[in-house]
């Protein structure tokens, strides 16, 4: 029997409770910062972002709102990154008029947006009260009364169609983290941690209204949005023949919503992908893939040559397959499941921001 004592804290204070030994677990809306990582006590080991100490439990949508006096109801991801990361940071209005951009909202939510977009400049201070600020943007997980919702596009010259890999129609999905104190877990804490990575726990997450890790499958015939994105937004290096081969190879397969993403130019998976590995392991043990063929399909961003990106996407697909084989203690997986590297093909987002590049740098699982 375990008794959970809960306290309502923001992310900063929750992580502080972990570091000071006042809590065993912290539910946060952002990852730990470098300053928080550096504040580990001597009796703690590892790091706050290590897969043993940090998992993405769910996702939630972040929304942007503007003042009613601002006629602009649309913004691309690249415009948003520029507004938050550049000086002076301008919010484009009609007739060529621009106003200084200001980001407001609760600290947790503004920091979650900045981490999501990989913009690490501190938000600009708001002008004194009473000063008109048509360039104000408010970030929130809830509806903001009397303000106007701003639609966010994945960018490039044309709006990108939704892709559905843990990032459906709304692109601003922020992870909800569960962080454990980086020290030896009590048995009950370890059991609870393991349970949260089971399909049953993810079903509960979805029931609560959050975006869960539960796998969803989509056939290639339902991927018209990805194909349109590839045709409209991929560099000329990505030949029509490559797209044809992608469709031929994936015909008859269904794409799972689980994906694995990598740090730029490496085969190192990010923290969210590490949690996906553990979740995938439990799906195997539950017999989810019994009697099915599986293919690990790698993709890249547009950094580097097209040929080099095909190779690195193939290497990443092989790395994920090998890691799964190790987790399952089944070396036959290295030969039993196919791998495919499609390089820059089928992009989920425009490559003109770090966020978009991270979305495209992935390995997907396709089954039939």
Q: What are the language-model segments listed below?
A:
Residues 1-84:
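N-terminal segment of the mature folded domain
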Residues 14-17, 102-164:
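Ligand-binding pocket segment of bilobal, Venus flytrap-like solute-binding proteins
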Residues 37-53, 60, 145-167:
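Ligand-binding "clamshell"
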Residues 61-70, 168-169, 173-188, 262:
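A bilobed periplasmic-binding-protein/Venus flytrap-type ligand-binding module shared by bacterial periplasmic
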Residues 77-94, 195-220:
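Periplasmic-binding protein-like
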Residues 202, 206, 214-293:
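Periplasmic peptidoglycan-binding/tethering modules of Gram-negative envelope proteins
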